[in-house]
Regions:
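Long, charge-dense low-complexity segments
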Residues: 2-427, 449-454, 466, 470, ...
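"A position-specific structural signal for the A-helix of alpha-solenoid helical repeats
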Residues: 448-453, 463-465, 477-480, 484, ...
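Residue at a conserved register position within TPR or TPR-like alpha-solenoid repeats
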Residues: 489, 564, 598, 635, ...
């Protein structure tokens, strides 16, 4: 009889090792099944145990300066109480209760994750619970960590999330025996693909267009509730109906080291069991992301998915598939299915090895494939002849793509890039090539640049070097050269020379009123595509025609203002600063310089109005922070100490490196105000003070709404130079994980 029982146990363990249908270490038995004695843990100390408060643990981890040490302390405490009877160890002491099976299981998973190992130093982490998933996220605080250290952090995170998800799958997790907890964990891993439609149903409104599809996919990656962190890179071409994912898979060595096997209970997981379980789970991830993408975005007809593993030594692709909507509809992702068979039915490259794990295969696509990343997305807006209609034009404030341009020299730059392919070491051939390029383009600006370069080559002032010729072609005008001399003088702290070079460069232009504008034409300069889009939406007059000034024009006025102010010539500085702010109304630097010059000329009220104008249009953290710092100084000098404190507090919310200075100033303010201020103001108090003083709360609702609409429109229109700049700043302000995911999905500009 004993021999039969031993043979039966070995048979069941062998089935757990090799049976593909019995996934994740064995199918869960019906509730209540399993070896006798599994429920005996509940009888320790008369059924009295401590309980695992996961929400309380989450709060403690989030506030802890060393979450790993806190978790290590939890493990030590649980181990010390295993076997406790519930009776006091010494007279007068409180009873020592044993841990619940859930506590024991969490401690076990943390030990399996290597939390207590000393072979690698774990990096500093911060624990957060993202709102989209509600899971634990261990954010590594150090820029560079070893592969093993990162793997350990991810394993600790997985231990926390596995227990969290298992506890949600149990009716009474703190009363559940160990086998029920482990079986619940395994049910969670087997059912991950079933959440695809449920998560897709949370999206608001129809998903249409490039922006909506990218938002939906980024949201899904953040919202999936998975026991192991999902790191995914993706690309989208909504017009072509295609999305592609590259998933970082779970390596077998990161898989739990114990599993439930039907008839055996919880047993140590062999290497083969872990390879098979990890391989099956990783294949399910492909079904999850493809199923979600197709459910969330009706415009998509096909989803490409590749699963990869990067270790300290190599990179491997474990599967590569192109999953069509029709192929996936044959499977019920919410039911029981074989994920490897699903991928094979879609024509995937996938190769299970003899252990049940996945062997490396060739990846069938790249995230940079032109199908996913059409090159025309990065065509220069300045040179575009495309038009914008309907909602796209309304959102971007213009009807021509070229009216989103910011680079006055874009045409010269384009011709110079093409010209570089035909330049040689021969002056004669270079002159011929330059003149031919100018004739082919025909634009007066290009013809003038060509004449300038040809003259320089013939006179010997310009070398027969492709880089030198290209630079002269684009930035070789009198204004640019004069501005460069002024910049060099300013960097050398020669203020007199800097001012002279700048004003000399500006004299021929401003003396003739070249950029004064008339008959609805205005001349403007912009530092970013985001600035231009907001200018179109919120500043430009109806029917206005906007031409671009060279960047050197704005820089020359800025240098002239700084030089004059440093030499005590406040009125002269004000004239230059006012012109710079007029030409670049979205430039925070021009606005700050103007406010400083107004204050220097004895007009703090005008300086305050200019800073209010800056804050009413500010849309990035640096502009907002510096605007509030400047306003705080004015308020402090005017005796409005509480309002100044409110400005400093708003500044610290947006600034990076200068925040320390702002905090020190705020501390000085709090000390000056004393008891009457009650210390630091609450956000509500600070906002009320600013509103009462007529100071905008940046970014304003108007700016935020226009910014989001413009970002969406530029993405849908496929104007990615504009879209990426807008999206980057949207991320900086919102700090929203979904927007960051969208930003990562935007490909880099292709080589041309």
């Amino acid at each position: 009889m004993a021999e039969e029982e031993r043979t039966g146990r070995l048979g069941r363990l062998f089935a757990a090792l090799v049976n593909v249908g019995d996934e994740d270490g064995g199918e869960a038995s019906p509730e209540g099944a399993g070896p006798a004695g599994q429920d005996a843990e509940k009888d320790l100390a008369g059924g009295n145990t401590t309980v695992l408060d996961l929400e309380g643990l989450s709060r403690s981890l989030a506030s802890s300066p060393d979450p790993m040490a806190l978790l290590a302390g939890l493990v030590v405490d649980v181990r010390a109480r295993v076997g406790a009877t519930g009776a006091p160890e010494l007279p007068g002491e409180a009873p020592k209760l044993p841990p619940s099976p859930l506590e024991v299981h969490l401690a076990t998973r943390l030990v399996e994750a290597g939390l207590l190992e000393a072979d690698v130093e774990l990096p500093g982490v911060r624990v957060v619970r993202p709102r989209t998933s509600g899971l634990f996220y261990l954010r590594i605080e150090e820029e560079r960590v070893s592969y093993l250290a990162k793997l350990r952090v991810l394993q600790v995170e997985s231990a926390l999330n596995s227990v969290l998800l298992a506890s949600r799958a149990l009716a009474s997790p703190n009363d559940a025996p160990l086998d029920a907890i482990v079986r619940a964990e395994q049910r969670v891993t087997r059912s991950v693909a079933g959440q695809a439609r449920e998560v897709a149903a949370r999206l608001e409104g129809p998903v249409r267009g490039e922006w909506d599809v990218r938002y939906a996919l980024a949201y899904g990656i953040e919202a999936f509730r998975l026991p192991h962190r999902l790191t995914a890179r993706f690309r989208v071409n909504a017009r072509a109906g295609v999305a592609a994912f590259e998933l970082d898979l779970v390596p077998p060595e990161a898989w739990p080291r114990s599993a439930f096997v039907d008839g055996l209970g919880v047993v140590p997981a062999t290497e083969q069991m872990r390879r098979r379980a990890a391989g099956t789970y990783n294949a399910r991830l492909a079904a999850l992301v493809a199923g979600y993408a197709l459910a969330a975005a009706p415009e998509l007809g096909e989803v490409w998915v590749a699963g990869v593993i990067d270790t300290a030594r190599d990179h491997a692709c474990l599967y590569s598939a192109r999953i069509s909507r029709e192929a996936l509809e044959a499977f019920d992702l919410g039911g029981s299915f074989d994920p490897v068979a699903l991928l094979r039915s879609c024509g995937a490259a996938i190769s299970p090895d003899e252990t049940g794990g996945l062997a490396p295969v060739r990846q069938g696509f790249s995230l940079d494939d032109e199908t996913l990343c059409p090159r025309e997305r990065y065509d220069a807006p300045e040179l575009s002849e495309a038009t914008l209609a309907g909602e796209l034009g309304d959102a971007l404030g213009c009807w021509r793509v070229s009216d989103l341009g910011i680079d006055e020299g874009a045409r010269r730059r384009h011709v110079a890039d093409e010209l570089a392919r035909h330049l040689t070491g021969s002056t004669e051939k270079n002159v011929q090539a330059i003149l031919a390029a100018a004739r082919e383009d025909g634009h007066p600006d290009v013809i003038e640049a060509a004449r300038r370069c040809v003259s320089g080559l013939i006179d010997g002032e310009l070398e027969d070097d492709a880089l030198a010729i290209g630079e002269s072609f684009v930035e070789g005008g009198d204004l640019q050269r004069g501005c460069a001399r002024a910049r060099d003088a300013l960097l050398s702290h020669d203020l007199e020379a800097a001012g002279k070079y700048a004003t000399d460069a500006l004299l021929p232009i401003d003396g003739l009123g070249s950029f004064d504008g008339s008959d609805g034409l205005v001349w403007r300069g912009f530092g970013s595509y985001a600035d231009r889009a907001l200018y179109n939406r919120l500043v430009a007059a109806p029917g206005e025609r906007c031409a671009l000034v060279p960047a050197a024009y704005l820089e020359a006025h800025t240098i002239a203002a700084a030089s004059a102010l440093a030499r005590g010539r406040a009125e002269e500085a004000l004239e230059h600063a006012r012109r710079a702010a007029e030409v670049a109304p979205l430039s925070s630097q021009a606005s700050l310089n103007l406010a400083q010059c107004l204050e220097a000329t004895g007009d703090p009220e005008a300086a305050g109005r200019e800073l209010c104008r800056l804050l009413s249009l500010a849309h990035d953290p640096e502009s907002i922070g510096l605007g509030y710092l400047g306003m705080a100084q004015l308020q402090w000098q005017g005796g409005h100490v509480l309002t100044a404190q409110a400005c400093y507090q708003r500044a610290t919310r947006h600034l990076g490196a200068p925040a320390l200075v702002a905090r020190l100033a705020m501390a000085a303010l709090i000390g000056q105000v004393g008891v009457s201020a009650g210390g630091e103001l609450s956000p509500e108090q600070a906002d009320s003070l600013l509103e009462a003083a007529g100071i905008p709360l940046a970014p304003t609702e108007t700016v935020s709404a226009a910014f989001l609409e413009a970002t969406r429109a530029a993405t849908d229109a496929g104007i990615f130079r504009v879209a990426r700049d807008l999206l980057r700043k949207l991320c900086m302000i919102s700090r929203d994980d979904v927007y960051f995911g969208m930003l990562r999905s935007v490909e880099d500009e292709p080589d041309r």
